[in-house]
């Protein structure tokens, strides 16, 4: 009997609303070819159950597994006693004046047309307002500046100015990166013109600050690679090696710290608000030119004010999140991880425009619910209980709790109430009812959890391909993104939504990215908890003799390929879908990727993740 179709005998009204997973529409799209390339045979493997984990006896005398997770780091006292003065009117008025002054700086650049630095000056302004996190105020100015730069773009790149005789690596690398990220059709072949006669990138032996900065921008550009762009891979290897060697030679200064940040976070794990916080510390410290100093002072003051003013908004939102967490009964759910503040911080780092409060709170709530459900299906619930819960969710009726164990009743109502509330918010933003659409996404997610619970209970180990197909759904990327995304002031009509959400390649890749990266960070801890099934174990079973190191190497190759495909899905020209519509889903991928950068930062949030929360959420920037 198919596990997904099993219905509780207690209620004949519990009906299956969609197909069992074995016939799901969640197919492997970009990965079937990759799997064949990696030599992964398609066959079933069995393994005995592994439950080397501490258990606890519940009130019903059932021995239940526990994850041994640390408790919530951000209790009521921490949140309730936050206080910042930057919500006061005087700070907002000062920020508005600075915004006007920075607009004047953009406008003054048109007076320098035809000079020897007009192109690099425009790129410098655009790059810096973006890295400082203040670009939302200057959308028109940015477009005007980039249109001007692109009008002088050639297949060999650009120089510092329109009167420059030769092209320049720094201008070209920065221009290529910025133009590509804004959707201009620029070819990576432009970088080939900076290789020597035997096709290799070479560095200037003088190693001036300009030479070093050229390599910084070459490295940053190389990370925005599309599939098949070999020159970008060469540029990344060369510039990364150069910058690492340079760090060993130059003294500690703002440039060395900038290089360290760029190497540490790259682009795919460099969340916009985190980048702004780090860049504020190094921006303009070594500027010697008086005119440049005046520009940097205004940009820096505005960036600091904007960062701190947003924290006053976050305080209010955190209070709202804390009320929801308490009212939902979450503190009484003792078997799960409580990371709602960490999830809120991630959301704040990718969407920190004031009007996106619904997204930030919705993302934190959705991710908290996902975590509770994940821990319940993986650890705490029995298979029979989980069948009941899965069927109850498909009924979508509070009376469905009658057939649930006591500990599941509150969890069910948390899901039911929160999904309904987020659907109401989405209806206000999108002008249509999306509840049934969201329910289907949640049902698909729970079906995939149910499949994994069956594997855990029976000790069954699927093929890599089958595991990944199910794992893309159980990654829960889709349900974490869908409803929060629909609360934004970005239009998502049905024809656009299907290019961003399921069944789009963007959604498929985002889900795969989270599953692959998550498994490389979690598989050892999961195994200790009795969860044998992972990308690593399935790959090793499919490839007898392969070691864990072999499996990790293969997965890292796949992840690198997925990143390039994600870049393409976001930035490909003439897709008919605005970049702004795709970018929030793309940035959610970056947020999850950051959470797994050093370890499983969601299970163990007391180290790097805690520092991340402190730096971007709780600590103001000194003015």
Curated annotation (Swiss-Prot):
Residues the record lists as binding Mg(2+) 1: 374, 378
Alphabetical UniProt keywords: Chloroplast, Lyase, Magnesium, Metal-binding, Plastid, Transit peptide
Binding locations of Mg(2+) 2: 374, 378
GO molecular function, one term: terpene synthase activity
Positions occupied by motif DDXXD motif: 374-378
InterPro entries: Isoprenoid_synthase_dom_sf, Terpene_cyclase-like_1_C, Terpene_cyclase_plant_C1, Terpene_synth_N, Terpene_synth_N_sf, Terpene_synthase-like, Terpene_synthase_metal-bd, Terpenoid_cyclase/PrenylTrfase
Reactions it catalyzes: (2E)-geranyl diphosphate = (1S,5S)-alpha-pinene + diphosphate; (2E)-geranyl diphosphate = (1S,5S)-beta-pinene + diphosphate; (2E)-geranyl diphosphate = (-)-beta-phellandrene + diphosphate
Coiled-coil intervals: none
Bound cofactor: record note: Binds 3 Mg(2+) or Mn(2+) ions per subunit.
UniProt EC number: 4.2.3.119, 4.2.3.52, 4.2.3.120
Listed GO biological process terms: alpha-pinene metabolic process; diterpenoid biosynthetic process; green leaf volatile biosynthetic process; terpenoid biosynthetic process
Disulfide bonds: none
Domain notes: The Asp-Asp-Xaa-Xaa-Asp/Glu (DDXXD/E) motif is important for the catalytic activity, presumably through binding to Mg(2+).
Family annotation (PANTHER family): OS04G0344100 PROTEIN-RELATED (PTHR31225), TERPENE SYNTHASE 9-RELATED (PTHR31225:SF98)
Stated family: Belongs to the terpene synthase family. Tpsd subfamily.
Protein name in UniProt: (-)-alpha-pinene synthase 1, chloroplastic
Native source species: Pinus banksiana (Jack pine)
Phylogenetic placement of the source organism: Eukaryota, Viridiplantae, Streptophyta, Embryophyta, Tracheophyta
């Amino acid at each position: 009997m198919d596990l997904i179709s099993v219905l509780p005998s207690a209620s004949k009204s519990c009906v299956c609303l969609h197909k069992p997973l074995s016939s799901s529409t969640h197919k492997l799209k970009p990965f079937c070819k990759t799997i064949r390339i990696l030599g992964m045979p398609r066959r079933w493997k069995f393994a005995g159950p592994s439950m080397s984990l501490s258990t606890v006896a519940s009130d019903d005398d059932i021995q239940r597994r526990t994850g041994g997770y640390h408790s919530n780091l951000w209790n009521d006292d921490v949140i309730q006693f936050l206080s910042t003065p930057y919500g006061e009117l005087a700070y907002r008025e000062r920020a508005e004046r600075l915004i006007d002054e920075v607009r004047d700086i953009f406008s003054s650049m048109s007076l320098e047309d035809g000079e020897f630095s007009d192109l690099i000056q425009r790129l410098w302004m655009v790059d810096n307002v973006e890295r400082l996190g203040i670009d939302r105020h200057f959308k028109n100015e940015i477009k005007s500046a980039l249109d001007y730069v692109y009008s002088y773009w050639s297949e060999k790149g650009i120089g510092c100015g329109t009167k420059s005789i030769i092209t320049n690596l720094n201008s070209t690398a920065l221009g290529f990166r910025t133009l590509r990220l804004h959707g201009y059709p620029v070819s990576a072949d432009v970088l080939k013109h900076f290789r020597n006669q035997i096709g290799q990138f070479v560095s200037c032996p003088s190693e001036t600050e300009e030479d070093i900065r050229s390599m910084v921008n070459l490295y940053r550009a190389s990370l925005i690679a599309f599939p098949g762009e070999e020159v970008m891979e060469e540029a990344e290897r060369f510039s990364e090696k150069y910058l690492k060697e340079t760090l060993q030679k130059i003294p500690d200064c703002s440039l060395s710290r900038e290089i360290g940040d760029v190497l540490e976070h790259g682009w795919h794990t460099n969340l916009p608000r985190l980048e702004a916080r780090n860049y504020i510390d190094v921006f303009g410290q070594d500027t010697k030119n008086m005119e440049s100093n005046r520009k940097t002072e205004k940009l820096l003051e505005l960036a600091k004010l904007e960062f701190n003013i947003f924290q006053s908004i976050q305080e209010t939102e955190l209070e709202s999140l804390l009320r929801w967490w308490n009212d939902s009964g979450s503190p009484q759910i003792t078997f799960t991880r409580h990371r709602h503040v960490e999830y809120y911080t991630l959301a704040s780092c990718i969407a920190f425009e004031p009007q996106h409060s619904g997204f930030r709170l919705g993302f934190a709530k959705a991710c908290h619910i996902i975590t509770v459900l994940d821990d319940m299906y993986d650890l705490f619930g029995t298979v029979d209980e989980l069948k009941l819960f899965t069927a109850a969710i498909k009924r979508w009726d509070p009376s469905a709790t009658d057939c649930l164990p006591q500990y599941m009743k509150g969890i069910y109502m948390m899901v039911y109430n929160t999904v309904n509330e987020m659907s109401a918010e989405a209806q206000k933003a999108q002008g249509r009812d999306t509840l049934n659409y969201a329910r289907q996404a949640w049902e698909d997610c729970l079906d995939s959890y149910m499949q994994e619970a069956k594997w855990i209970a029976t000790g069954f180990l699927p093929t890599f391909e089958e595991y990944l197909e199910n794992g893309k759904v159980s990654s829960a990327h889709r349900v974490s993104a869908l409803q929060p995304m629909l609360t934004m002031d970005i239009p998502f009509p049905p024809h656009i939504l299907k290019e961003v959400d399921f069944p789009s390649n963007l959604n498929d890749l985002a889900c795969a990215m989270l599953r692959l990266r998550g498994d490389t960070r979690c598989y050892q801890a999961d195994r200790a908890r009795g969860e044998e099934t992972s990308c690593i174990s399935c790959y090793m079973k499919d490839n007898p003799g392969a070691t864990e190191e072999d499996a990790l190497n293969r997965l890292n190759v796949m992840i690198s390929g997925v990143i390039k495909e994600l870049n393409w899905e976001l930035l490909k020209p003439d897709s008919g879908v605005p970049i702004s519509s795709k970018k929030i889903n793309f940035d959610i991928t970056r947020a999850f990727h950051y959470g797994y950068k050093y370890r499983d930062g969601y299970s163990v949030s007391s180290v790097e993740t805690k520092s991340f929360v402190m730096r971007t959420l709780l600590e103001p920037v000194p003015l």
